Amino acid sequence: MSADASFHSIIDYTVDGPDTQQEFVAAFAEIQERWVRFYPGYQSARFYLSTDGTRVYTIVRWASEADYRNFVETSDTEGRMAAISQALAGLSGRAEARMTGIPTYTVAREVGPGPQRLDV
């Protein structure tokens, strides 16, 4: 596979059930639309729901770390954080962040489809 220079922010929340998962995704998708997606280098935000109804992972993909850093330096962080707080307060259930530190990552390796290796 070719090298992937993209940069990711992986946001992890614990929630109290499937209804809260759905509310969380709706609220945080709106935050992406209003506060993030128009920045240069933004590629996508994908929301993953655990099948047991207890977790939501959001993976925000940027074209590069430089694009992400530009977003951090030039965006309205205070306004975005207020919108996040308001979104969390508006949920009918409970959602708690599980990240520690800055939740940013680069791709180290990816294994894609191909023939089975038999040289074990």
What are these model-predicted stretches?
Residues M1-D4, L118-V120:
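Basic/polar N-terminal segments that are highly enriched at the extreme N-terminus
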Residues S6-T14:
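Active-site-flanking beta-strand signature of metal-NTP-handling nucleotidyl enzymes
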Residues T14-A26:
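Short, surface-exposed ligand-recognition loops at beta-strand->loop->(often short) alpha-helix junctions
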Residues T100-V120:
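Acidic/histidine-enriched, glycine/proline-rich intrinsically disordered or flexible terminal extensions
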Residues E30-Q43, R61-T100, D119:
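An amphipathic, aromatic/His-enriched active-site/gating alpha helix that lines ligand/cofactor pockets
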Residues G53-R55:
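A generic structural signal for beta-strand entry/edge sites
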Residues Y48-S50:
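Short beta-strand micro-motifs enriched in acidic
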